[in-house]
Amino acid sequence: MIYLDTSVALLSLLGQPGADETARLIMDAHATEGLISSCLLTVEMARAAHREHFDICVVDEFIAGVELVEIGPDVIERASTLTGELKSLDAIHLATATLLDNPRHPVTVLTHDARLADAARSRGLGAINPLDS
């Protein structure tokens, strides 16, 4: 299962260096394993659309291909233990990913954030930074 962090989603939409490789990884994951993320992705991407002046419809189309997970009490509790090493929103993403991880469906975090990738790996999750490919 591929957990999509906002940093990678935005990289693919904003046409930044590495956007083509990132878009390819996202499309491959969508076709083979599926994409999952916290519903926080919606808020962060809408904010970026406003900040970067691009059409919110692009965000809506992108998010339509991602299974979104609610931020429940279990996510908040887990994220609270991660805020010493991560920013709050990254802690919510990592908490969500760790709660989804299981032996039958291991989670790999797709992120452009080195600190989040390291934190994911230290908790037994896979992590891919498309710019390292």
Language model feature labels by segment:
Residues 1, 38, 42, 98-133:
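Acidic, PIN/NYN-like endoribonuclease modules and their adjacent C-terminal/linker elements
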Residues 64-96, 100:
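Acidic catalytic patch
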